[in-house]
Amino acid sequence: MDTAAPLPRVLVIGLDPYRVPGPWDPTPVAEGIAAGLARFADAGVGVETCLFGLDGSDDVEAVVTEALDRRRWEVVVVGGGVRSPDQLDLFERIINLLRRHAPDAAIAFNSTPADTFDAAARWLAPPG
């Protein structure tokens, strides 16, 4: 029996909930991300994450570019924190990086961290 993890087909780009400034509890979002990623494993679909902080510790464009260039992605999911109105500039930069570095990838948007698999599945080609 082959127990190797499937090759990643999906990249999830989003905010690291533990590195978003402000007085808020990141635990529910982190738990939602973990639950959403578990659904990929349950479906046998490989996934990688590209989570970055807004605390100034990341060169966001470099981090995202490195992740996009790592392999050919079938789907890239852009998380909701990146799409919030106060992050419009960041959202535009990420979409343009996607256009340049993963032009063949479908772009998907989740509505919550827990439904990230559903967002990707809308665009995944059937296996085989």
What are these regions (language model features)?
Residues T49-D58, N110-T112:
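Short beta->alpha junction loops
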Residues P17-V20, D55-S57, V82-P85:
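Short acidic, S/G/P-rich loop/turn micro-motifs used as interaction or catalytic elements
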Residues A35-G46:
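Short helix-loop-beta junction
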Residues V20-G32:
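Glycine- and acidic-residue-enriched helix-capping/strand-helix junction motifs
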Residues L90-G128:
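Ser/Thr/Gly-rich flexible loops in soluble cytosolic domains mediating phosphotransfer, phosphorylation
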Residues D55-V64, D118:
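Structural motif
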Residues A62-L97:
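Mid-chain, well-packed structural core segment of small domains
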Residues M1-G22:
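N-terminal, charge-rich interaction modules
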